[in-house]
Every structure is written in structure tokens, then in C-alpha cells.
């Protein structure tokens, strides 16, 4: 499948991945990214509050890999107006060579685009609106069952529209964006969400600290047990 992506695009992708600090070494993209965990880490690197890493379990089993990808698709990629079809998720989970690259390349574009819009100071209402007129971007390897594909103009795989945009009355979004009370409500909701996320992060840190203490205690118990066994053998 990697044949549908030009060498320069792959080279740029590998350089990009190498510059992102991840929890485990990157030796083989098809295998390393197959469980979705590193993809979640990549997104978290750009938008830390968008991803909760405890939801993604490093896995070798196909079932757990698909579970990770399904959760990532539903809870995170959807916020980026991006989606990975089930058949593609399965191929990635099975470590099919060259498939994950066809997802990572457009995902990188979407992440950098959103980051650029944030730096330019575009408001949250505009951020939530897809720029291409669709509800989300769909990335695939085949054109069957979902209609004809739309080739990426840069030759980096295939991008396909997953569904038609929801029709909206003309001027409706502009009226909402200019309504001070609506903007205030959005700002308040965003503050509440941030406060909730911070609380969750504090609790997660406490849980990790307790898990670390428990691990240290287990190591200490094993060490004492080993010494006790050695002492008993010497007495015999």
C-alpha cells in the first residue's frame, strides 16, 4: 500500500514522527502504531487536553487494538473532523505494511492546520467548523461500499468524503457568532470543561503515584521474601 505514497512524502512523515517524543522507540511504523496508542500520543503532543492516555492500552491482541482505534476514532479524531474507516483500522491493527502511513499523512496535515488556526487567534466557533464543508474527513484504502474516492492532490494516499454536510439556514452561523450572550455561554462552558479536565488530570496523577508506591512495595516484599528463603536454606 505504501506504493500510493511518494518517497518524499514518506520521508517527511518519518522526520515528523521522529521529532515527536513518544513512550516507546519507533522501529517499524506498521507495527509500532498498530494499537493506536502512539497515534493518541501524537495527537496529545499537539493538543494535550484532547487525549486521555489511560483510555488506550498497549496491546498485541487484535481485539484490544481495534478497541483502542474505535475509541480514538469516536472520542478524539471526531473532534478534528477526521475519521478512519473500520476496514482501514483492521488493516492497521493487523500491521499491514504501508497502511498506517496513509492515515498519518493526512492526520499530520489536519493537526498542523488546526494548530495554525489556533495561533492565528481564530475563535472556538470557527475551529469547530470543518474547513472543507464536510462533517469530517474520511481516510481509506478502497473505494467500494462508500463511493468513489477523491485522490489527495499531493499524492499522499486517498481522502474521501464520508458523508454530506448538514444543511444550515443561510446566515444562521453568522448570527450565532455575533450574539454576545451565545458567545458568553460558549466561553463559560469552555471554562467549566477546562476545570473538569484539570480535576481529572490531578486525580490521574494521584492514581499513578499510588500505583508507583504499590509497585515499590511489591518489589520490597519480593526482596524480603527472597532473603527469607535464602536464610531458611542456610539454616538447613
Curated annotation (Swiss-Prot):
One of its GO terms (molecular function) is actin binding. Residues 118-177 are annotated as: Disordered. Keywords: Actin-binding, Cell membrane, Cell projection, Cilium, Cilium biogenesis/degradation, Cytoplasm, Cytoskeleton, Flagellum, Membrane, Microtubule. GO terms for cellular component: 9+2 motile cilium; apical plasma membrane; axonemal central apparatus; axoneme; basolateral plasma membrane; ciliary tip; cytoplasm; filopodium. It is found in: Cytoplasm; Cell projection, Cilium, Flagellum; Cytoplasm, Cytoskeleton, Cilium axoneme; Apical cell membrane. GO terms for biological process: axonemal central apparatus assembly; cell migration; cilium movement; filopodium assembly; lamellipodium assembly; microtubule bundle formation; negative regulation of microtubule depolymerization; regulation of cytoskeleton organization. Residues 183-236 are annotated as: Essential for homodimerization and microtubule bundling activity. Residues 7-112 form the Calponin-homology (CH) domain. SUPFAM superfamilies: Calponin-homology domain, CH-domain (SSF47576). The keyword Transferase does not apply. The keyword Membrane applies. InterPro entries: CH_2, CH_dom, CH_dom_sf, Spermatogenesis_Ciliary_MAP. PANTHER family: SPERM FLAGELLAR PROTEIN 1 (PTHR12509:SF16), SPERMATOGENESIS-ASSOCIATED 4-RELATED (PTHR12509). Microtubule-associated protein involved in the stabilization of microtubules along the axis of migration during radial intercalation. Promotes the establishment and stabilization of an axis of microtubules required for the active migration of cells into the outer epithelium. Microtubule-associated protein that promotes microtubule bundling and stabilizes microtubules against depolymerization in response to cold shock. The Calponin-homology domain mediates its binding to microtubules. Radial intercalation is a developmentally reiterated form of migration by which cells move in a direction orthogonal to the plane of the tissue from an inner layer to an outer layer. Homodimer. Interacts with actin, TJP1, CGN and CDH1. This is Sperm flagellar protein 1. It comes from Bos taurus.
Amino acid at each position: 500500500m505504501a506504493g500510493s505514497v511518494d518517497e518524499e512524502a514518506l520521508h517527511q512523515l518519518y522526520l515528523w514522527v521522529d521529532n515527536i517524543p513518544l513512550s516507546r522507540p519507533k522501529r517499524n511504523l506498521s507495527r509500532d502504531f498498530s494499537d493506536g496508542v502512539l497515534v493518541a500520543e501524537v495527537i496529545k503532543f499537539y493538543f494535550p487536553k484532547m487525549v486521555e492516555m489511560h483510555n488506550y492500552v498497549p496491546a498485541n491482541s487484535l481485539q484490544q487494538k481495534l478497541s483502542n482505534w474505535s475509541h480514538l476514532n469516536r472520542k478524539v479524531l471526531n473532534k478534528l473532523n477526521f475519521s478512519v474507516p473500520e476496514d482501514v483500522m483492521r488493516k492497521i491493527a493487523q500491521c499491514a505494511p504501508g497502511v498506517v502511513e496513509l492515515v498519518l499523512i493526512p492526520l499530520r496535515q489536519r493537526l498542523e492546520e488546526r494548530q495554525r488556526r489556533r495561533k492565528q487567534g481564530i475563535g472556538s466557533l470557527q475551529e469547530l467548523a470543518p474547513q472543507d464543508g464536510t462533517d469530517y474527513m474520511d481516510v481509506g484504502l478502497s473505494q467500494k461500499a462508500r463511493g468513489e474516492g477523491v485522490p489527495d492532490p499531493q499524492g499522499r494516499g486517498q481522502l474521501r468524503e464520508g458523508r454530506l454536510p448538514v444543511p444550515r439556514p443561510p446566515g444562521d452561523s453568522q448570527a450565532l457568532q455575533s450574539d454576545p450572550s451565545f458567545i458568553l455561554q460558549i466561553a463559560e462552558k469552555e471554562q467549566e470543561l477546562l476545570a473538569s479536565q484539570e480535576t481529572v488530570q490531578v486525580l490521574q496523577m494521584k492514581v499513578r503515584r499510588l500505583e508507583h508506591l504499590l509497585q515499590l512495595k511489591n518489589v520490597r516484599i519480593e526482596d524480603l521474601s527472597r532473603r527469607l528463603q535464602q536464610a531458611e536454606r542456610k539454616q538447613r
